[in-house]
Amino acid sequence: MPADPSEEVAPQVPKTELEELQINAQGVADESLESTRRMLALCEESKEAGIRTLVALDDQGEQLDRIEEGMDQINADMREAEKNLSGMEKCCGICVLPCNKSQSFKEDDGTWKGNDDGKVVNNQPQRVMDDRNGMMAQAGYIGRITNDAREDEMEENMGQVNTMIGNLRNMALDMGSELENQNRQIDRINRKGESNEARIAVANQRAHQLLK
């Protein structure tokens, strides 16, 4: 049975240049929206990583504090032991003859001066407020083409990304400052450890002389 001519598919009307531009604009809007979503997700991941790093640095700082307190306690104990050794040496007459006088430990005052890891230092990075953030917020982050819900979401996403980037920058400054403080503290701990080691060696030598 021959097909009804009225049911034949009408030939496709070619799109006008305006329609082509509108289709392209819709595609660009979809791609841009997905890009802002990915940016927001990456910022969230970076924020979580930054928080974990700050927590780890805080835990590490507490461990360093305990180590340094231990060094200070060893130093205090050794001072007390040296007083006792001096008293025993006097009782045993070791110090009567200059040739028999034992060598006392000479302490470097700079090693045991007050801890400065918690003080503000001149090279501590300062947080700088960027006025461009406010200017961007007033003018908008994107150039609107379709003026639909997608562009509203893009604008909101970009605002959140801008805020997160500012927070990440501040977190990075905090990390850098904390690392500088901890590096100085590690240097102090090393100096105190070397001082305690030398002090113990001298005390052992004095004790051996008492036992002769």
UniProtKB/Swiss-Prot annotation:
InterPro entries: SNAP-25_dom (IPR000928), T_SNARE_dom (IPR000727)
GO biological process, one term: synaptic vesicle fusion to presynaptic active zone membrane
Xref: Pfam families: SNAP-25
Superkingdom assignment: Eukaryota
Reported tissue expression: Exclusively found in brain and ganglia.
UniProt-listed SMART domains: t_SNARE
Keyword Transferase: no
Keywords linked to the UniProt accession: Coiled coil, Repeat, Synapse, Synaptosome
Localisation per UniProt entry: Synapse, Synaptosome
One Gene Ontology MF term: SNARE binding
t-SNARE coiled-coil homology domain segment(s): 26-88, 148-210
Principal cellular location given in the protein's record: other
Cellular component, GO annotation: cytoplasm; membrane; plasma membrane; SNARE complex; terminal bouton
UniProt similarity note: Belongs to the SNAP-25 family.
Protein name in UniProt: Synaptosomal-associated protein 25
Organism taxonomic ancestry: Eukaryota, Metazoa, Ecdysozoa, Arthropoda, Hexapoda
